[in-house]
């Protein structure tokens, strides 16, 4: 339906899509007209804006995004707090890498700036073809268990995942600002 309405869809997954915020109401209205039920909501079969930003209770939207591929993206989001002040944050996903590891890795690459900038810089490096290593044990602050063939359980002393995205193979989707 969004495509039929010429709404840009930046990334989709099984139960989500990123579209232009100012077109959400158009899409939900048309959906209701066509199918006789509400599209927007938190029930099964419904969609909703799932950005969450501490201190904001109203509308929250993405101001810029890097989409590396399915389940690998960053949105810099903003909303207004109760004092009508702008609050800026982020919404991140990286399949196979916990959010705490994203923060840990971003902090290694960029110092002395806020988390939004650190994370944006790390995603931007990936967007431009750099390989980034993610220490999934976060320098010993996380534990990952290993189930051995002899029915014993141990823990991993090293666990690094190196990711890269190759634009020549069409893996990269886009940067939207």
What function would you assign to each model-found segment?
Residues 1-10, 18-177:
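C-terminal, non-catalytic extensions of nucleic-acid polymerases
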């Amino acid at each position: 339906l969004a495509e039929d309405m010429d709404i840009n869809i930046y990334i989709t997954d099984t139960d989500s899509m990123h579209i232009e915020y100012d077109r959400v109401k158009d899409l939900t209205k048309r959906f209701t007209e066509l199918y006789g039920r509400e599209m927007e909501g938190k029930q099964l079969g419904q969609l909703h804006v799932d950005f969450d930003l501490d201190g904001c209770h109203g509308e929250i939207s993405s101001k810029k995004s890097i989409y590396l591929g399915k389940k690998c993206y960053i949105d810099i989001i903003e909303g207004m707090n109760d004092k009508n002040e702008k609050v800026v944050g982020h919404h991140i996903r990286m399949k196979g890498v916990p959010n705490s590891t994203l923060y840990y890795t971003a902090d290694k690459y960029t110092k002395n700036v806020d988390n939004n900038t650190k994370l944006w810089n790390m995603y931007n490096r990936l967007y431009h073809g750099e390989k980034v290593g993610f220490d999934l044990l976060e320098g010993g602050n996380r534990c990952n268990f290993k189930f051995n063939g002899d029915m014993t359980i141990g823990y991993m002393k090293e666990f690094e995942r190196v990711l890269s995205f190759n634009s020549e193979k069409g893996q990269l989707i886009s940067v939207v600002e």
